[in-house]
UniProtKB/Swiss-Prot annotation:
It comes from Weissella paramesenteroides. Keywords: DNA-directed RNA polymerase, Magnesium, Metal-binding, Nucleotidyltransferase, Transcription, Transferase, Zinc. InterPro entries: DNA-dir_RpoC_beta_prime (IPR045867), DNA-dir_RpoC_beta_prime_bact (IPR012754), RNA_pol_asu (IPR000722), RNA_pol_N (IPR006592), RNA_pol_Rpb1_1 (IPR007080), RNA_pol_Rpb1_3 (IPR007066), RNA_pol_Rpb1_3_sf (IPR042102), RNA_pol_Rpb1_4 (IPR007083). Pfam families: RNA_pol_Rpb1_1, RNA_pol_Rpb1_2, RNA_pol_Rpb1_3, RNA_pol_Rpb1_4, RNA_pol_Rpb1_5. It is an enzyme of class 2 (transferase). Zn(2+) binds at C752, C826, C833, C836. PANTHER family: DNA-DIRECTED RNA POLYMERASE, DNA-DIRECTED RNA POLYMERASE SUBUNIT BETA. Binds 1 Mg(2+) ion per subunit. Binds 1 Zn(2+) ion1 per subunit. GO terms for biological process: DNA-templated transcription. It comes from the Bacteria. This is DNA-directed RNA polymerase subunit beta'. Its cofactor is Mg(2+); Zn(2+). Its EC number is 2.7.7.6. CDD domains: RNAP_beta'_C, RNAP_beta'_N.
Length: 1054
């Protein structure tokens, strides 16, 4: 209880009560003159302007006292809302006296707003809409929208002008005393002070009956002060504080990433969290992380206290707290028990997809760095060069259960974007397993036959055989669960020492892996078996060695194991694969030295030849046989070919036991272009403006670069750095917008019973397959049954899920088009149904009702965005080739902007009758004779044609190379064609960069892009012509009208 509660001090007016009222009690300023609210006057479109049907410029003149406005015409020739200058006003006043009324400032606007008869306006606008076209119609639709909103909500238009300004509670605009008696205060206090000062001055002036011009000036200043308070900088120059810094107004407090919503309401800093550098924890299991004792102590403090009191190790909470601060031995014992079975969440910024936060069980470690399991680094995109991660402790039982059941790292083996394992071994683990499964011909002990694995181990430990030695083993000694045939069991199996050890880590009943092929994942080939007594050494002398298991194959093994055994067995296999990989890579002793980079003897020859070709091209240019841009293109092509030739020769020269080659071949680190730069030539570089320079860097890093070459390569290096920084921000922003659009797409029901489907074929780019049919149909439901064209056998029934086996059989039957259920043709409102979505990529099972597929889709498209190349790549300003690629192209598609390097679409089906060039205005004219009419299209001279004279062309096809505008496709063809185009284009960009994304994610996004309909004819519905609305609402309105027997509306998708 507070003494003197509720008593108000008579000196300073402060009430005695609890301090928290300083966060809830508000004040207000009663204004001496009304002021307009800048949001309603300055917003786009201006709400005041729409209600009054006046231009924002006229309103500004009235509100800021530049012009008078007639508020009541009376019996004079003046009309309401007519603007008058100071001089005109004086002259008219002299002529008509008080027969008319005019005013200026927010007061006049308030009067005008109060005069608006909303009901009447609605009737008039609806009538106008029936006749109006073009801009007039657009304006009418906007006005009707806002006026109907006023009618529905019961708000009055004159309330857009304020007579009273509220003041937010004092604790939300704090003032703190600094040392030295100065004060630091929130900007809002400054802004409020300006309003109060001007308001008080205005009151005094009005009491004194000051001259009109002074009062007007004061009212304008009050209006400006109120504007600055609500949204500083929206109109005119912002009000600045000390050091010319614009003050943060109420709007700034809410707006953007640092505003109230995104900073404090959607994402808060939380207790029981920490952050530290991460380090690798090779000793951890798949679901564990190493937690430094010091951090554990703080994070689990309340749990430890409770346990200490419970075990009578501390008398009360305060004693327990002291014990923890002293780091007593009791505390350490309790800590071990407390963290058992208590999962924690680890997060690494930027969190681009849902695998950026996963749950682990903590294991106490010494030191100050958190230890992360090496296999989850890929999901987090983490490395150990100083990255930091945040840790959070779920407190409630529900939170812990959720973390355990849904978020444990061991359960996230497949990536949601493409359904491929995301926890595949990398780097050391890959090279270890690669080294282990390598075979070498003629190693010590080749052709020895052993009775079982233990004998092989003994022989290996005693150096009778090498890891790479090819040997034989009695098949009957291998585990009984292995799927060998009876015939194979009775024979000797041919394999290598390392492969025997590798197969030890696989599940008991998994096929014995002897060669990295898809077939071997299901059964082992008979050619690896010999009858007892056959000459094994002679056999080995004739058979070539088998390739080792590379990174991709290890991934395939994991995917196959996951498919058969699901989560638990897969995470155990992953841990065994990791341990084996680390052990073997340590034993292999792989290094990189200068001697691994060998000189290429053919290089001088290739370079000399390229120089000769360049000289020829230059000569042709000097004689005027070719243009400068053709010369440039040819030079670039010559050097690119020279570089490719050198690369090819390099690969031929590499020995299979060259350490660098092994690293790259296994997929552990590095690729061919790194080699070309080390041992071949660096090649062409891009100048800062993105144009490729004609002078290549001929040297490689083994020889060393000259000063000029070094200088050239700095351009490329700088561009690389800036691109990466820009790309990360761009990609993150794109993900945010995608999520925003798609977050309400959820799996709502089992089946929408749609009778439409999507015909899918392989996605091609010219003759190159970008996405094969197999990947497009896998995990989807068939809309129509598919039959084998030869045998007539049913491969898949209507509404049946296409599994790996079915997809394989469809491809083997030579079928090129399959009709599947798709998100495009789904009838479910506000979401998608299970049948139209198909398999959940992250689990490999059918998607469940309630899954937030929209968010998953947005993350799956946004997350690889950082891997896409930035910028458009200019090969020397040749117009035909300036087609956007990479991230900007993806943004261009999703925002439906007019594409750069646009391709013209034909609106008629017919024959190309002529292509005429007009050198004068640098254009080409293409004429197409359709069945009913002839069309002529004008293209730039530089456009690369896809059609020639006499070609037949179909409506909706492109005439020249480039990107079509989806907005044109939707007008010429239909929604489905547009959605299909979007999927194809996005896939092209991602697949070119080697990023795989499942179609269904792009389908979900494309469906959201085409969700709106523009009402063309409202029929007898309540819809307004020209309005944009959601397709579901449009259908509902039509269904209601049809039930009442009225005419339905017609609309056009946009």
């Amino acid at each position: 209880r507070i003494r003197y509660k509720g008593i108000v001090c008579d000196r300073c007016g402060v009430e005695v009560t609890s301090a928290k009222v300083r966060r809830e009690r508000m004040g207000h300023i009663e204004l001496a003159a009304p002021v307009s609210h800048i949001w309603y006057f300055k917003g786009i479109p201006s709400r005041m302007g729409l209600v009054l049907d006046m231009s924002p410029r006229s309103l500004e003149e009235i509100i800021y006292f530049a012009s008078y406005v007639v508020t009541k015409g009376g019996d004079t020739p003046l009309t309401e809302k007519q603007l008058l200058s100071e001089r005109e006003y004086r002259e008219l006043k002299a002529e008509y006296g008080n027969a008319f009324e005019a005013g200026m400032g927010a007061e006049a606007v308030q009067t005008l707003l109060a005069n608006v008869d909303l009901e009447e306006e609605v009737t008039e606008l609806k009538a106008e809409l029936r006749e109006a076209t073009g801009q007039k119609r657009v304006r009418a639709v906007r006005r009707l929208d806002i006026i109907e909103a006023f009618v529905k909500s019961g708000n009055k238009p004159e309330w857009m002008v304020m007579d009273v300004i509220p003041i937010i509670p004092p604790d939300l605009r704090p003032m703190v005393q600094l040392e030295g008696g100065r004060f630091a205060t929130s900007d809002l206090n400054d802004l409020y002070r300006r309003v109060i000062n001007r308001n008080n001055r205005l009151k005094r002036l009005l009491e004194l009956n000051a001259p009109g011009i002074i009062v007007q000036n004061e009212k304008r200043m009050l209006q400006e002060a109120a504007d600055a308070l609500v949204d500083n900088g929206r109109r005119g120059r912002p009000v600045t504080g000390p050091g010319n810094r614009p003050l943060k107004s109420l709007s700034h407090m809410l707006k953007g990433k640092q505003g109230r919503f995104r900073q404090n309401l959607l994402g808060k800093r939380v207790d029981y969290s920490g952050r530290s550098v991460i380090d690798v924890g090779p000793f951890l299991k798949m679901n564990q992380m190493g937690l430094p004792r010091q951090m554990a102590m703080e994070l689990f403090r309340p749990f430890i206290m409770k346990e200490l009191v419970k075990r009578d190790l501390a008398g009360n909470i305060r004693a327990a707290k002291r014990k923890i601060d002293r780091r007593d031995d009791d505390v350490m014992d309790v800590l071990e028990d407390v963290i058992k079975e208590h999962p924690v969440l680890l997060n690494r910024a930027p969190t681009l997809h849902r695998l950026g936060i996963q749950a682990f069980e903590p294991v106490l470690v010494s030191g100050k760095a958190m230890r992360l399991h090496p296999l989850v680094t890929e999901a987090y995109n983490a490395d150990f060069d100083g990255d930091q991660m945040a840790i959070h402790v779920p407190l409630s039982d529900e939170a812990q259960a959720e973390a355990r059941l849904l978020m444990l790292a061991a359960g996230h083996i497949l990536a949601p974007k493409d359904g491929k394992p995301i926890v595949a071994p990398s780097q050391d683990m890959v090279i270890g397993n690669y080294y282990l499964t390598t075979e070498e011909a003629g190693r010590e002990g080749e052709g020895m036959i052993f009775k079982d694995v233990n004998e092989v181990r003994t022989a290996y430990q005693n150096k009778y055989v090498h890891l790479h030695t090819r040997i034989g083993i009695q098949t009957s000694s291998l585990p009984a669960a292995k799927p060998f045939t009876a015939e194979q069991r009775s024979r000797i199996m041919l394999t290598s020492v390392g492969k025997l050890f590798f197969n030890d880590i696989l599940p008991e009943d998994f096929p014995f892996l002897n060669e990295p092929t898809e077939a071997n994942l299901h059964e082992i080939d008979n050619r690896f078996f010999l009858e007892p007594g056959e000459d094994i050494k002679a056999h080995y002398a004739e058979t070539p060695i088998l390739p080792p298991f590379k990174k991709g194959y290890l991934s395939d093994i994991i995917a196959e194991v996951y498919k058969i055994y699901k989560v638990t067995e897969t995470s155990l296999l992953l841990d065994r694969m990791k341990d084996l990989g680390y052990d073997e890579s340590t034993k292999s002793g792989l290094t990189v030295g200068v001697s691994d980079v060998t000189d290429l003897k053919e290089k001088p020859e290739i370079i000399a030849d390229a120089h000769k070709q360049v000289a020829t091209v230059t000569k042709q240019f000097r004689r005027g046989l070719i243009t400068d841009s053709e010369r440039y293109e040819r030079v670039i092509a010559i050097w690119n070919k020279a570089k490719d030739d050198i690369t090819e020769k390099l690969i031929e020269h590499f020995e299979p036991d060259n350490n660098i080659f092994m690293m790259s071949d296994s997929g552990a680190r590095g690729n061919i272009s790194n080699f070309t730069q080390l041992a071949g030539m660096r090649g062409l570089m891009a100048a800062p403006n993105g144009r490729i320079m004609e002078l290549p860097i001929i040297a490689n890093f083994r020889e060393g670069l000259s000063v000029l070459e070094m200088f050239f390569s700095t351009h490329g290096a700088r561009k690389g750095m800036t691109d990466t920084a820009l790309k990360t921000a761009d990609s993150g922003y794109m993900t945010r917008r995608l999520v925003d659009v798609a977050q309400d797409v959820i799996i709502r029901e089992l089946d929408c019973h749609s009778d439409r489907g999507l015909d899918v074929t392989a996605i091609m780019n010219g003759n190159e397959v970008i996405e094969p049919l197999y990947e497009r149909i896998l995990g989807r439901y068939a809309q129509k049954s598919v039959f084998d064209p030869e045998t007539g056998e049913t491969l898949v029934n209507h509404n049946e899920m296409i599994t790996e086996d079915i997809a394989k059989r469809i491809i083997e039957a030579g079928i090129t088009t399959v009709t599947i259920r798709s998100a495009f043709t789904c009838n479910t409102e506000h979401g998608v149904c299970v049948r139209c979505y198909g398999r959940n990529m992250a689990t490999g099972d059918v998607v469940e009702v309630g899954e937030a597929v929209g968010t998953v889709a947005a993350q799956s498209i946004g997350e690889p965005g950082t891997q896409l190349t930035m910028r458009t790549f200019h090969t020397g300003g040749v117009a035909g080739n300036d087609i956007t690629q990479g991230l900007p192209r993806v943004q261009e598609i999703f925002e439906a902007r007019n594409p750069k390097g646009r391709a013209m679409i034909t609106e008629v089906t017919g024959e190309v009758t002529s292509i005429e060039e007009n050198p004068a205005d640098r254009t080409k004219e293409v004429t197409i004779q359709g069945e009913t009419d002839t069309r002529t299209y004008t293209l730039p001279m530089t456009a690369r044609m896809r059609v020639g004279e006499g070609d037949r062309i179909h409506r909706g096809e492109t005439l020249n190379e480039g990107s079509a505008d989806p907005k044109e496709i939707i007008q010429v063809r239909d929604t489905l064609a547009t959605e299909n185009y979007i999927v194809h284009e996005v896939q092209k960009v991602y697949r070119m960069q080697g990023v795989e994304i499942s179609d269904k994610h792009i389908e979900v996004m494309a469906r959201q892009m085409l969700r709106k309909v523009r009402v063309m004819d409202p029929g007898e519905t309540d819809l307004l012509p020209g309005t944009l609305m959601d397709i579901a609402q449009f259908r509902d309105a039509n269904e209601d009208t049809l039930l009442k027997g009225g005419l339905p509306a017609t609309g056009r998708p946009v």
